Amino acid sequence: MIKQSLNGEDMQKSLVSLAWVFVAILGAICLGVLALHKGESINTLWLVVASACIYSIGYRFYSHFIAYRVLKLDDNRATPACVRNDGKDFVPTDKAITFGHHFAAIAGAGPLVGPILAAQMGYLPSILWILIGSVLGGCVHDFVVLFASIRRDGKSLGEMIKLEMGQFVGMIASLGILGIMLIIIAILAMVVVKALAHSPWGFFTIAMTIPIAILMGLYMRFFRPHKILEVSVIGFILLIIAIYAGKYVSLDPKLASIFTFDASSLAWMIMGYGFVASILPVWFLLAPRDYLSTFLKIGVIGVLVVAIVFVAPPLQIPKITPFVDGSGPVFAGSVFPFLFITVACGTISGFHALISSGTTPKMLAKESDARLVGYGSMVMESVVALMALVCAGILHPGLYFAINSPEVSIGKDIADAASVISSWGFSISAEEISEMTKNIGESSILSRTGGAPTFAIGLAMIVYHILGDPSVMAFWYHFAILFEALFILTAVDAGTRTARFMIQDLLGNVYKPLGNLSSYKAGIFATLLCVAGWGYFLYQGTIDPKGGIYTLWPLFGVSNQMLAGMALLLVTVVLFKMGRFKGAMVSALPAVLILSITFYSGILKVMPKSDDSVLNNVSHVAQMQIIKEKMATTTDEKALKTLQKSFFNHAIDAILCVFFMLVALLVLIVSVRICSNAYFKNQIYPPLAETPYIKAA
């Protein structure tokens, strides 16, 4: 009887093993078809199946290996949420809820914008980097940083670097992290500005989310406390009404003029909004928008995945375009190394390290939950990145370039734009551009850089294929814009608040009262500094002749990837101190790859002028030299002022790029020294800062 039972178990294991072998072969076949296909278009189902297979294998086997062979997660060990359960910051939470919270926090504009910009090089480079890079790098990054924070009482990334690498390194790293945070917030806000500029329908809808969120906050605070689902449903209904009302606002000439703003005006508005929102009580605006954006985000992404499977639209953008050489109009740089920093959050993101060492480690009820929350959430984010790539890829290539190319490249007139884009080898007529503009209810789609409009048009086209009625495209386009802007603005709110705390922490070392988090005046002062920091980059991006995204996104990518590299180095140091030298390779190898790519791209961004026009477009220093030459021959006063501003902006960007590289280099050198001492000399200094073992109740 026992023998029969054992044979049955062996048979079951064999069948499971065969099933996983089949999944691996199926994934390899689908990926091979995507890579070797030579036709004009290819069905997106090949991508859907390939990604499902690769993510399943990565989560089932690689994350399990990391969890129980490298990190050795222990559910008998109490987490910070259990040890310090205060009902406020530290609260043991069901892993499904924690997963939703963490995913909502990390899935910002990055996975939507990066792959859309990278589509100028074709679909294949992005697909390969997103699939392979996320499974072996990005998901690992989020998981291991979350583990490190759990074992250190839920401490932040900067605090952990200070504990594990020393006070001086921690202080410099904290400065670097703050600078990177400001760049991240600026680029998030830039995406919203580019989506809402000259769009009365879009601006009205987003403006209405503020009173809706305040109403939700008051309702939940004073009338129906803790009824999150109920108030979110009410908020969602009001949002749908706002979208419908926005259509009639855009059709009325007087109302349309009231709600139409250019990019620079919107930048000032978002700065003012970010300042006010970050000093208001969390329950009044931030929390209700967070609830609303979380439900909306998870719901829309889920529906989009199902819709893509159901419609199976063909990818029209080529497998590889001529712009892999870096001559493309959407962003500066060749496929190596700039594809990697452009896709950014869709594969690996340093910003996630701030979340994985922020609120999330204070919510985990068991250590094993970190596998689903850390690794699993990043799997979902990379799925979002693939969905964004699909939304860009199903568009006519000419239409894609009409939307994402800056005005300086294609001009203001539709006929001129169609002619220029056709000369690039992507034939499109002015009538096709005009028809899409009319279908989505906008006055223009030319040079709507930033990724959000492209994603929205792609989503609207998928819905159109389901319903077969082009009249629905306008509603769904603006619904997608609302969806993107809502959770991006929530990230701007939360990012400004987080950066304010970081500024106060740093200022407290200079003048102690400024570090008092309970001081209202100190909080306002720190918030002003924070908003001024990210607001500067936002405003300069709006007046940039190349659209801001062209120059700002690569700087964001470099800084964000350097932050990811520093976080992986921290975990490598921790694992070396724990004596897990072989296991440390799961973080050390991605760190080496990411930092190598990022240092190379960072160096290219500060190289002097050369005969290579592509490198000159990438380099801030080269641009400064070119602008200086123009300034010497310009007599027009207005043009001279514009050139002076541009020169100053490139100088700031170059200085920041060098600073971020120096910070990352310092962390790298100290990490190598600590790991070498641990491996060769068995010297652990600074000592491992892991909190003492406390048995779970």
What does each of the following model-derived ranges do?
Residues I2-A24, I57-L112, T294, S334, ...:
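Membrane-interface "cap" regions at the ends of multi-pass membrane proteins
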Residues I2-S5, S63-V91, L117, L131, ...:
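Flexible loop linkers connecting adjacent transmembrane helices
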Residues A28-S41, L112, L124, L182-H198, ...:
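Transmembrane helix-loop junctions in multi-pass membrane proteins
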Residues G32-K38, N43, D89-R152, L163-Q167, ...:
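Membrane-interface helix-loop-helix modules in multi-pass membrane proteins
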Residues S41-R60, A118-A148, G158, F203-T209, ...:
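Extracellular loop-to-transmembrane helix junctions
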Residues L45-C53, I57-V70, G176, P200-I243, ...:
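Membrane-interface loop-to-helix entry segments
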Residues E164-L182, G376-V383, T449-G451, P470-A480, ...:
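Loop-to-transmembrane helix boundary motifs in multi-pass membrane proteins
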Residues I308-V324, V379-I457, A494, Y536-G547:
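Extracellular/periplasmic helix-exit of transmembrane alpha-helices
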